[in-house]
Amino acid sequence: MIISTKKGAPQAELDRIIDNFEHQGLSVTLIRGTDYNVFGLVGDTTKIAEKDVLANPWVENVTRVSAPYKRANRLFHPDDTVVDVNGIKIGGKSPIAVMAGPCSVEGEEHTLKMAKLVKAGGANFLRGGAYKPRTSPYSFQGLGTEGILDLVKAREATGLPIVSELMDEAHIDEFEEYVDIVQIGARNMQNFQLPKAVGKMHKPILLKRGLANTIEEWIMSAEYIMAGGNENVILCERGIRTFERATRNTLDLSAVPVIKEKTHLPIIVDPAHGPPSSSARSAA
């Protein structure tokens, strides 16, 4: 349920509204606007009569939210969320942020070389995988902590904030200390213990869409993170699996306007997983 107040509602009245609903066992989020304020209620609101809420002279409107996601819902938060990472803003009307770097971190020298190249090319962030989710158990699984430290050294040399994928709760402390944006990959989007865990982190979370997940399922994964207290979530469209075999994945660009309509969260696009080869990616 969403409650909008009239312009000029006093703070004492806002506090009274919050106390009233919290005493009914609901979670209340207050979003302050320029002209009015919005309350987002999460919990069982079926017993709350709209006419009783509207009886308050300071209440302008009451809306019931049918979508299963609440905190990520644009109705709860009309203004775009802007995530600030070391002074670089992502979302809203901010300039487009570019994240680039090696798929896998392969050593200090190589990582530093890549960092300098992507910075020269205009990138704002250095991304690199220290822990790699692989389809085959025989493929390179990443350098682990050594790779994270290589990224840190590259950040010190170039000033680029780093983005890297977290695959296991056991590494949360390491990522909290060293990584600027923590990525949850496509394969772990619905590994809900991980979104729950990063909801307690103090770093922005980059949440990739799963290989075969609907937009609603994707947003619900973000809801897990936000329900844990971390509202700095960035969504990433990276392509989904379809009947098409000429490409690795089908990049669903139509998801971008849908996400911007349904949620207030920033969204970025990863074009690297669609083309079938590196040469095709270069051509794109």
Regions found by a protein language model. Give the residues of each.
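Short acidic amphipathic segments
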Residues: 50-65
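Glycine-rich, proline-tolerant flexible connector loops at the mouths of alpha/beta enzymes
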Residues: 127-145
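Short, well-ordered coil/turn segments that N-cap beta-strands
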Residues: 94-96, 122-124, 156-162, 178-180, ...
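N-terminal amphipathic alpha-helix/helix-capping segment at the start of soluble metabolic enzymes
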Residues: 67-99
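Alpha-helix-loop-beta-strand connector modules within alpha/beta enzyme cores
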Residues: 140-164, 197-204, 253-268
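Catalytic beta/alpha-barrel core
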Residues: 6, 143, 159-170, 180-192, ...
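Active-site mouth loops of central-metabolism enzymes
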Residues: 8, 95-113, 137-141, 161-165, ...
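Catalytic alpha/beta core domains of metabolic enzymes, predominantly
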Residues: 85, 201-284
